[in-house]
Amino acid sequence: MDATALERDAVQFARLAVQRDHEGRYSEAVFYYKEAAQALIYAEMAGSSLENIQEKITEYLERVQALHSAVQSKSADPLKSKHQLDLERAHFLVTQAFDEDEKENVEDAIELYTEAVDLCLKTSYETADKVLQNKLKQLARQALDRAEALSEPLTKPVGKISSTSVKPKPPPVRAHFPLGANPFLERPQSFISPQSCDAQGQRYTAEEIEVLRTTSKINGIEYVPFMNVDLRERFAYPMPFCDRWGKLPLSPKQKTTFSKWVRPEDLTNNPTMIYTVSSFSIKQTIVSDCSFVASLAISAAYERRFNKKLITGIIYPQNKDGEPEYNPCGKYMVKLHLNGVPRKVIIDDQLPVDHKGELLCSYSNNKSELWVSLIEKAYMKVMGGYDFPGSNSNIDLHALTGWIPERIAMHSDSQTFSKDNSFRMLYQRFHKGDVLITASTGMMTEAEGEKWGLVPTHAYAVLDIREFKGLRFIQLKNPWSHLRWKGRYSENDVKNWTPELQKYLNFDPRTAQKIDNGIFWISWDDLCQYYDVIYLSWNPGLFKESTCIHSTWDAKQGPVKDAYSLANNPQYKLEVQCPQGGAAVWVLLSRHITDKDDFANNREFITMVVYKTDGKKVYYPADPPPYIDGIRINSPHYLTKIKLTTPGTHTFTLVVSQYEKQNTIHYTVRVYSACSFTFSKIPSPYTLSKRINGKWSGQSAGGCGNFQETHKNNPIYQFHIEKTGPLLIELRGPRQYSVGFEVVTVSTLGDPGPHGFLRKSSGDYRCGFCYLELENIPSGIFNIIPSTFLPKQEGPFFLDFNSIIPIKITQLQ
């Protein structure tokens, strides 16, 4: 953080606050006093040497409290008339026309100028306001003059047109490759662009294109990948824009108080996109999206602290400086990371209000500021409406930023948690700007929640992490902007707050008692005790290289459970060149979600399992034992961290796994690495396959070779292979039985050489599945005897033969 820049912010906000205060514009004054206080808090964190900084913070916050009653009593300024709004839309049309004009998009510019002229003339005839008429006519003349000047070259004979006078308008072709949305702050140039994110940095395969096309339709609406052509999206119209998909479905709580849909100009006479990005200003209402609002809050805090466009960069239209701007025509575009790529979400600016005219969606405490409500609306549209089933910050932050999600469970039997190591890691990474953090509570009784001031299963934004003389603290924000922690170090704790600690944490309990803004300090020990999960989102810019593969796992491929066989699981080869000093490689598995019910009742438990098998296919889950085993969770994102300490080449097999495979899933595997690597799907070397359906029944259920009297009664198949080549044989039987098979050479054509054998088996008998892979089986005739371990174990089985050479198979017995 830059202390000097934050001091400048504080001075600017304080000046604006005092100015608005004197003008009687109390709502705006409250907003700027809060921002000035927040800027000073961050400045002190960054090492500011300003004198009396704590006194100034207290002064601003006390003035906020004093102004609250004035805000309630003061009547709002009159709203703009329809004709004034038409003038604003005409100005915006001309502004957009100027932009197209500068880019030499002549036809688009002429169209926008012409529409501005028509709107100005129409409105000037409708209004009796002479001043407004003059403004409209002047704007119409300017637009008309420029439109005529641009039209002249288009009307000249073809032979007289200069080769440089008018550029042909390129066709609006959408390529298959999404715009490199750059969620990676300060990404090194060597980073492999998402435009070409298969294993070798080539273009998408046909399968990947089909995956991205299929998962573009979310809750019945198509959200196409965000591409370069979308930067030319049209935002200016003579009439207010209306989303062709209609109004968003409301939640049950919204419906009880809903009155109507309004546009920003119906709420304020001075709507703007962003006054300043601030976590203090965000307020959640009755939509059940606490994790999303918490995600917005920490993204805003990050943008403020590190001056990186983490959240404001995703809203369009934008001005020439890349700043999002208010559009009086009511159309906006938000770029969200969904189902493998950044995607384009179009919304209008209609928002729900109650009978008092209060917004029923999240909003900024500065009522003229729109960014909070509009980003929330875009996300709610994708999620199927304001009747949002709820989420977690891993999902929401990934959608907003594209950063890498990680989940730390503090009370899990399957995941170890170290309080000391975790705090040290969070403290260091948070202050470096490497990570965004939220914390969520688990289930608790109403009495427990009331006692501690906590909301069950609720997400809180982490705004700060501090350590003071062995004491460790986390600053949290409740997205509701009220209701705070009531335990140790709350504003009402008279025992633990010392003057020294108050100064270090910039916290005055007496001032905090006057204003409940939902922001509080909690000790690390108490957070670990009363909260359930910490959600992290890591800056991908920490890794200089990355690539991804989009794919599909068909529900028909393999058994429902992969507890005994991984033969049908998607598998990938990862080869890493580890330098001296070691390196980190992270692998993110993301399941694509296209339906609100799937999102609300996620029953797909996915994970990634890592094996050290030199990139060869793995068939048995525990043989060899996993290098890194996965925990199957019903979250769409699963992060695997591989830490390398030894220099050289390391080769892994990555296996996608599910607890119970019920449905076909589409997914993305994305690899992030601090060093060079290659990543590819493990291909099958076999081009031919045959399946034999058999069964053990009655006498033919003879058991293994230990039972000599009955083993000879097992089914026997004979296969004939004409040329030497690789062969894979797989046996699948009832999971409750241990199965195996034996291959016996009957005869070979010529000298079999080193590949010849008398007998080979599938090894130890295993539950439900076994296999034998021969790199080179000599040409000849062979018998295969499948069996269960014990006699009299009846049931069906499948024998699968996979090869590159035709095989003839007959049943002998």
Swiss-Prot record:
Q: Which GO terms describe its molecular function?
A: calcium-dependent cysteine-type endopeptidase activity; cysteine-type endopeptidase activity; endopeptidase activity; MIT domain binding
In terms of CDD domains, this protein maps to: CysPc (cd00044), MIT_calpain7_1 (cd02681)
Q: What's a Pfam family this protein contains? A: MIT
Q: What is this protein called?
A: Calpain-7
A GO cellular component annotation in the UniProt record = extracellular exosome
Major subcellular site? nucleus
Q: What does this protein do?
A: Calcium-regulated non-lysosomal thiol-protease.
Q: Which gene encodes it?
A: CAPN7
Q: Which PROSITE patterns match?
A: CALPAIN_CAT
- Positions carrying Phosphothreonine: 95
Q: Tell me which species this is from.
A: Homo sapiens (Human)
The cross-references to InterPro entries, in alphabetical order and at most eight, read: Calpain_cysteine_protease, Calpain_domain_III, Calpain_III, Calpain_III_sf, MIT_dom, MIT_dom_sf, PalB/RIM13_Calpain-like, Papain-like_cys_pep_sf
Entry keyword annotation includes Repeat: yes
Family per UniProt? Belongs to the peptidase C2 family.
Active site at 290, 458, 478
Chain segments carrying region Domain III: 541-701
| Keyword terms | Acetylation, Hydrolase, Nucleus, Phosphoprotein, Protease, Repeat, Thiol protease
Q: In which tissues is it expressed?
A: Ubiquitous.
Do the record's keywords include Calcium?
Answer: no
Q: What class of enzyme is it?
A: hydrolase
Task: Write the Enzyme Commission number(s) for this entry.
Answer: 3.4.22.-
- For the modification N-acetylmethionine, the affected residues are 1
The SS bond pairs are none
The record's region (Domain N) falls at: 702-813
